[in-house]
């Protein structure tokens, strides 16, 4: 099934390489070692339990980690020491935000705060990592509707700079899905600016390899071509959210629904996208760009 996506993926990577050259820097020539550790910062589309899992199972980054051969765990999991960690929090903007509690769930804890938590753990030696085999994945902006494009870009670039100052070298910055109605406007506005982040940072951070991930377009691919991936319903949610006192009774076939909650993909969709992310990472490694 994912083989059918190979042509599109190759085209996206070719476009990424071409835009890199046009921006005034050469594609990377030294491939990173195989990814053995990953740290994720983002919002509900990546949250696997740090704040609130807005769906019925793992998100795409967790499936990416699984395909890479390791487990991704919520950063607040007591058993997470020495593991790949997911700091993503549902409702997060790319900037700062202390968040708010809904019962046991935490919503809106900003990506700046997530990165600061990671930085504090590195500085206190609770976290150590090998820069040559560690990937830092940033997927944010869906909740930045009231921030300017410049603010979003500055937030993400500042967070990448912080991680770079701690020794990070390998980064992916996600483009956003433009086909999902709830987020179409902000994604369409932000994506052209997000696409320029690698060119800017690679020229300023010696040794860093910052790449775009077509994470958002991968969701769009599934949404626009559902039959290829075994998805039959791209319109209706499978269940409501219990934390908002909605009927959380699941539909009879969540594995065929693009959405599980309103505006948020099912874990079946996330698994498909996770496979695409894996192909993307491996293609970038092979090209020496990651």
Where are these regions (language model features)?
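Conserved active-site regions of diverse hydrolases
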Residues: 22-290
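Bacterial N-terminal signal peptides that target proteins for export
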Residues: 1-9
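Bacterial N-terminal signal peptides
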Residues: 9-17
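Short hydrophobic/aromatic-rich beta-strand motifs
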Residues: 1-2, 17-19
């Amino acid at each position: 099934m994912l083989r059918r996506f190979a042509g599109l993926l190759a085209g996206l990577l070719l476009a990424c390489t071409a835009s890199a050259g046009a921006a005034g820097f050469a594609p990377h020539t030294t491939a990173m070692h195989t990814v053995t550790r990953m740290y994720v910062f983002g919002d509900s589309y990546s949250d696997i339990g740090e704040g609130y899992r807005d769906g019925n199972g793992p998100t795409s980054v967790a499936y990416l980690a699984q395909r890479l051969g390791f487990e991704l765990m919520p950063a607040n999991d007591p058993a997470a020491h020495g593991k790949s960690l997911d700091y993503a929090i549902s409702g997060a903007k790319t900037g700062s935000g202390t968040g708010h509690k809904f019962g046991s769930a935490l919503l809106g804890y900003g990506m700046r705060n997530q990165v600061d938590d990671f930085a504090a753990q590195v500085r206190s030696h609770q976290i150590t990592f090998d820069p040559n085999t560690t990937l830092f994945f940033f997927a944010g902006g869906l909740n930045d509707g009231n921030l300017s494009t410049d603010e979003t870009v500055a937030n993400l670039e500042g967070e990448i700079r912080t991680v770079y100052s701690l020794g990070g070298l390998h980064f992916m910055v996600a483009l956003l899905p433009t086909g999902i109605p709830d987020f179409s406007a902000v994604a369409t506005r932000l994506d052209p600016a997000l696409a320029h982040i690698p060119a800017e940072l690679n020229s300023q951070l010696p040794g860093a390899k910052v790449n775009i991930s077509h994470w958002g377009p991968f969701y769009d691919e599934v949404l626009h071509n559902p039959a290829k991936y075994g998805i039959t319903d791209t319109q209706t949610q499978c269940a409501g959210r219990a934390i908002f006192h909605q009927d959380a009774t699941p539909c009879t076939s969540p594995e065929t629904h693009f959405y599980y909650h309103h505006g948020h993909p099912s874990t079946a969709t996330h698994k498909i996208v996770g496979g695409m992310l894996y192909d993307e990472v491996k293609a970038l490694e092979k090209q020496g760009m990651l």
